[in-house]
Amino acid sequence: LYYEKKNLMFLGDHVLFDITPNITAWFGVKDSLNNYINSLKKIREFKMDTALPAHRNTKGMNVYDRIDQLLEHHKARLADTEKVVKMIPNSTAYEIAAYMKWQMRGKNWEEFPISQRWFAVGETIAHLDYLEAKGIVKCDIDSEGVHRYTLI
């Protein structure tokens, strides 16, 4: 929501300043990560003197700098996803997520809280969908209905 007279934007969870919003795959939504990236670029064009996230706080950070950080984060996450798919071809999103770089509370993937693994796998699928839409990876569904990813 943008209030033009005050150059004020209510960001919701779209831009959070001290954590990265979880961009996940949604049934019926093609390439949710691409939608998010395009939306970040679009809101970056607004003049914002005040940017208000739905929760947490801005930590005094400039909204434009934060948008740039989020775009860089997803660029790095895409590179990490592609690297892991190359390393373990014909793998599931869960297997790929286990090899990716996360800020974890546990020492390893198995100690990562199950709810956080759920978020990580959803985000991994969103990044795989993006790479698939760009023609970088392909998804094959095996005889048991399991989605498996390989580089093209």
Show the residue positions of the predicted features.
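Metallo-beta-lactamase
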Residues: L1-A79
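C-terminal regulatory/interaction regions
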Residues: K83-I152
